[in-house]
Amino acid sequence: MKITVSVSALRAALTHSADKDVRYYLCGVYLDCRVGRIVATDGHRLFIGDVEAPADMDSFIVGNADAERIVKACGTGRNIVSSSVSFSITKTDNKVWITAELQDGSKFTFPALDGMFPDYRRIIPQVVQSAIPAAYNGQYLADAAKALAIYRNRDPKKAGVLVHPAGNDCAIFTDGEPGAMVLVMPMRLTNDAAANARAVTMSLEWFRSAYPGVSAAA
């Protein structure tokens, strides 16, 4: 059995995987074959993309270094040799081995990243409330736009995102098309809850006074 993933999806997921994290199982890209998804998270934001996968194939984690090696071997632009990668797995004793095959026949075999990937589905908000204000790390917003553009194989410099905040839950970022999304945890402007509330109020008051013709409500 094999799962085939576009190089664009693999590159997009790598923008959200953890780097040198003690939770080593986050330092890679998770292929959830049960539901056909490619997933990556660093604990603060989460990338999810759709892929086609056999439902009876075991899920596995491709470590960052191996994923980056595969992406590099696929090439880019005029030097592209493969636009997709087929993954298969074999088990020996307590070890899971992954074989990645490119469209030109090149193959890479390496061990799967050990550990259990967290149940990412639990943090997906059940209710999205666009009226609740929240603050987000600015770099994470840029990374969300970049990841979604890469997934679509588009220019990240021209990418925009739709933001669907959910209060204290993760906000959902999409590009208006099905197949991929990024989840980002909101951040506190300060460690003082009262100060954060005042900051929201002050921002709205300033907005109303500076632009009296525009309605602004929390």
Question: Model features per residue range: what roles?
Answer:
Residues 1-218:
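DNA polymerase processivity clamps
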